[in-house]
Amino acid sequence: MSEMSYLEKLLDGVEVEWLPLGEITKYEQPTKYLVKAKDYHDTYTIPVLTAGKTFILGYTNETHGIYQASKAPVIIFDDFTTANKWVDFDFKAKSSAMKMVTSCDDNKTLLKYVYYWLNTLPSEFAEGDHKRQWISNYSQKKIPIPCPDNPEKSLAIQSEIVRILDKFTALTAELTAELTAELNMRKKQYNYYRDQLLSFKEGEVEWKTLGEIGKWYGGGTPSKNKIEFWENGSIPWISPKDMGRTLVDSSEDYITEEAVLQSSTKLIPANSIAIVVRSSILDKVLPSALIKVPATLNQDMKAVIPHENILVKYIYHMIGSRGSDILRAAKKTGGSVASIDSKKLFSFKIPVPNINEQQRIVEILDKFDTLTNSITEGLPREIELRQKQYEYYRDLLFSFPKPETVSN
């Protein structure tokens, strides 16, 4: 049976009426549900929500003004971006621009049917547009309601569509969880073998401080007021926001040769190892990466080019393995933003075996890297494929005959 014939069989010849969303739903402003506290903590129990990608901003211990979605689920809708979420648990709201949307009559229109249909609409958000979208736009959009004159039949059709999409959603979430678990297992396995390979008995090899292993470079920020430093720049200017990868060959920002010549930032040769030395991320991890191209750094970064007879890949793997130890030894105490004490960083010691042993270790770890990276790269692709498959069937289930008067 084809997908279209399934929808036709589901409708079984019934009439479909396209009704304005504002006629079948109602909304509530979030005023009495807005969170007052600014500090959230994972030990608290009430989620603080936004309709955007972040969704759960944190947790609060406030006990008043809780929206009880556990009793009656709700759609939260961002009045500016049109982002929306299905919520079936109690929460506090963060933004006054959020609307809580519910069905006018649960005996005629299933709210989750509305939610799934709402997500078939293309985003109309425009950067800088501060127009309130629900009243001026979305409440007037028309949603297909099968046989509205027969609520029992209508709810049966809506329920079947919701059931199918719930199943697709659950399967997609299950697959994502399985792939993520596989990736985490591979990473743990890789970290274990890496740490074993980079562990040496006392006296077995020479130990050097990080300051002794190579030439270190600092970073700087060319003046933002000089357009000639930034416009049409071609030299990577790496900052902590670029350090989500272990191999870096591009950056979010680029600068010009003039900026290198006339500012505190310096051009660093290719095949350096960069680390973040000032960022809130240092409260959790020490980001490090192999920089494959000539590049510059901002002032929150440092990079090293190892001396002769010390392989860059060996130092890259070693810093990755010793990241937690380096943080414990060199992170400054106090201060509004976490940072690394350069003197303590440069005095941190690591084992440096002969170059043949370095090469052996690097070859083994590179093989593990290749395996882990293939899974890391494949995971988003597989998830994206499943999401597109889900969206295809979702849109198909809502492909009701549309009269010419409906222009959604």
PLM ranges: what are they?
Residues 1-408:
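Charged, alpha-helix-forming regions
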